[in-house]
Design a protein with these regions (language model features):
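Anaerobic metallocofactor- and corrinoid-dependent redox/one-carbon enzyme cores
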Residues: 1-433
């Protein structure tokens, strides 16, 4: 076995042995090392304000208003362009965020601890559907929901996870793959398991028993008319919000996947990809043995199904850190576990199996934690090898949401995106040195 193969074996074994557990909730500036009041994190590789896409610019502007640094869009845009605000990838701070991925200093975040290798990873709270900051929206409705998440939702689930003694996210992913999820774009099973695991502790929290609090309540009447009265307990509202949002578990899953990927990073001679991320302008990867160096290329527009009234010309290029799921062997790599997803992203069930089968060509292992019943419980393809990607001319398969190119309009569809091959070629050239 060559030095590279030995290194890749070590890296992927570390990835699969990682044990990410949700242990706490905390304010970003208090718990993420290096965060300061003028630093805003975003999805993807590094980017300047001038090159940011519409959804990312909108999310940054919304974040500035939410933080009280600007009163309106005009002030926010001027401040963002002034150089007084610093921008950095979530990945530089062991964090991840879906779509625009903006994490502001005062936002509450999931804290995931790797119980095997040590260390922590982070992600923000999921806002649900409709107008949301992660798609660049920042009207009063968006800001109200963000405040409720930070001031009601976060304190309740923080107390709940303490009572529970933590939540094993890896176990939830493994179970969900047996229930029709892929761990990225289809989250119904993961969220159901997430709620089932935490619900009994939510109702036991002191915060959850409150029926009076100063933070404006969310309108949860879409879940049940009961919530129109405004006298439900905070616990009931938290559980109703979780019920209304299939993406409830996604951010914690992403942070758990970041934990697994981080475990494989920094292995000398390894050619494994340990980061994939997009900022709406560029797609970037990092490789285990090349440190913090990014290899980037222009992000492609996903190919998929569009919601009524939208078309391909409305789409923004690929955006978000959620591709960390594919990096560790789920998402598009586990599509065979979730054939129903083709109703959302296009194609037919056979395509889901073809996607997973093709990914075995560019990976170094079959995952010993995540397996697919319909493939005789074969482990998902795990550990993307830059050499194999270039040699076989096969890029990773990623399933993803599609954002509108203008800030604030939101998701306009979902589909499959192929990363640009140039990044992998550049990474291989660097490795050859």
């Amino acid at each position: 076995m060559s030095k590279i193969d030995q290194a890749n074996k070590k890296a992927v074994e570390r990835m699969m042995k990682s044990r990410p557990v949700w242990v706490d909730i905390g304010r970003a500036r208090d718990v993420i090392p290096g965060i300061k009041d003028n630093l805003f994190l975003h999805a993807g590789p590094p980017i300047t304000w001038e090159r940011m896409s519409g959804p990312l610019k909108g999310a940054i502007m919304g974040g500035l208003i939410y933080e009280g640094k600007a009163k309106n869009a005009e002030e926010a845009e001027k401040l963002a362009a002034s150089g007084e605000v610093e921008f950095a990838p979530c990945h530089h701070y062991n964090s991840v965020g879906p779509m625009a991925g903006v994490i502001t200093p005062s936002q509450m975040v999931f804290i995931i601890e790797d119980k095997e290798w040590g260390g922590y990873t982070y992600s923000n709270m999921n806002e649900g559907y409709g107008k949301v900051l992660r798609y660049g929206a920042f009207d009063d409705e968006v800001l109200k929901r963000l405040r409720w998440l930070d001031e009601v939702y976060a304190p309740v689930i923080k107390e709940a996870v303490h009572l529970a003694g933590g939540m094993d996210i890896k176990s939830i992913i493994a179970q969900a793959l047996h229930m029709g999820d892929d761990g990225h774009n289809r989250n119904r099973a993961t969220t159901s398991l997430f709620i089932r695991t935490i619900a009994s502790f939510v109702v036991e929290t002191d915060w959850g028993k409150k029926t009076e609090y100063d933070t404006p309540r969310l309108d949860l009447s879409n879940v049940n008319e009961y919530f129109k009265g405004g006298k439900a307990t905070a616990a009931a509202e938290v559980l109703a919000f979780m019920h209304s949002n299939d993406l409830t578990s996604l951010n914690a899953i992403m942070a758990a996947c970041k934990s697994m990927a981080l475990a494989a990073h920094g292995v000398e001679n390894s050619t494994l990809v340990t980061t994939m991320a997009r900022n709406g302008t560029d797609f970037g990867i990092r490789v285990s043995s090349t440190g913090d160096k990014w290899f980037t290329a222009p992000a492609n527009v996903p190919d998929g199904l569009y919601f009524s009234g939208f078309k391909a010309s409305d789409a923004n290029p690929d955006i978000g850190d959620s591709v960390i799921t594919e990096t560790v062997g789920i998402g598009g790599f586990a599509m065979a576990a979730a054939p129903a997803i083709v109703n959302f992203i296009g194609g037919n069930p056979a395509d889901a199996f073809d996607a997973t089968n093709e990914m075995y060509e560019i990976t170094v292992a079959e995952n010993n934690n995540f397996n697919i019943p319909a493939m005789d419980f074969r482990g998902t393809p795990t550990g993307i090898d830059v050499r194999k990607v270039v040699e076989k001319n096969i890029v990773p398969r990623i399933n993803t949401g599609i954002a509108h190119k203008e800030a604030g309009i939101g998701q306009v569809g979902a589909g499959i995106v192929k990363p640009p091959m140039e990044m992998f070629v550049e990474a291989l050239k660097e490795l050859a040195k």
